[in-house]
Amino acid sequence: MRVAVVSEFYPRAHDPVLGVWAHRQAMAARDAGADVRVVVLYRPIPPRATRPRDAPRALRTLAAQPRHATLDGIDIEYVPFLAPPRPLSYGTWGAWAAPTLALALRRGGFDLVHAHNAVPAADAVLRARIRAPLVVSVHGGDVYYTATRHASGRRAVHRAFGAARLVLANSAGIEAAARDLGATRTRVVRLGTDLPEHPVAQSRVPTLVTVGHLVARKRHADVLRALWVLRDRHPDVRYRIIGDGPERGPLEDLAAELGLGDRLELCGQLPLHDALARARQGHVFVMPSVDEAFGVAYVEAMAAGMPAVGAAGEPGPAEIIGAGEGMVLVPPADVEALAARLDQLLGDADLRRRLGDKARETVRRAFTWEACGRATVTAYEDALR
């Protein structure tokens, strides 16, 4: 079975962790028997938020992206396209990307196209008139943002979901949202992680860890405020954040305002291997984010025997906690409840160990890349019937 994977989010020369989950799923599908090639849609124009003095360097970096690469044995073609800037035009990006995508796929040689997200990838596939069965994976952006913020985006999402032979969601909550937007044939295919072969040595200092882009919805600020509530009960606890983004400055300012500047460790964006190594040295993984479709970072931490804390009512944490133990939930945006749960976990090493053991077992049973690969290939086979 020959599969063309089309994605906007995929590792690039200047950003090797962007969409790494899409690459790992492609690897998992290949290892489960599919013949996979990847086409990446990328817009070689700096984001509108780029500072003017940084724009020339950003433009050179984007322009230097090779058109072809091989990563972990998978052939990748990077297809540039021009489009107006986000956010209002995002729903139309499929139309802008379609001509160059059509050229990239004109040779054919595949039985099925797997598009990550309805917009722009699946919409571009449809507009390029690619004559192959279409599978669409929805990871949250289509249902949380694209379909709710622009009429053009909503139309594109409806069109893609309606045309797909199968829509794959990363959690049951996202599957339900996709069906509300016109998807008829759906199933949940969970993403995964690797289980460490050996125990990971923890930091000597009690450490909370979050891995995620520094954006407001990840609620890093809530963790800082909870740490302030616990400042006297747990004076040695540190908070390590792995990731980067627009909230870095505000988080540094908040930490200074709360008197926690010496407790906050901002690691920036790290290569995946280094990010996992640093994250798994922690004692508790905490990410009380909202609009969380899945959250691979939770299961990556749990695989190493770390208990995880997430927000109640979110599709991703609900999917994980529904599969087994090792994760606890708190009401979203409730700093006092978050502080109470962290106080419990930080103050009881036996509880952390028990929850950590259960977390690792939950991942072993339900969230490995091997399981994801098998489920993905089964979905491909069903879409071809």
Q: Predicted segment positions?
A:
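N-terminal subdomain of nucleotide-sugar transferases
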Residues: 1-64, 70
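Nucleotide-activated donor-binding/catalytic signature segment of Leloir-type glycosyltransferases, i.e.
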Residues: 252-270
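Aromatic "clamp/platform" in nucleotide-sugar-dependent glycosyltransferases that forms part
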Residues: 290
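Carbohydrate-associated surface elements
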Residues: 173, 192
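Conserved donor-binding/catalytic core segment of Leloir-type glycosyltransferases
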Residues: 168, 200-227, 240
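Conserved acidic donor-binding segment of nucleotide-sugar-dependent glycosyltransferases
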Residues: 322-323, 327-336, 344-349
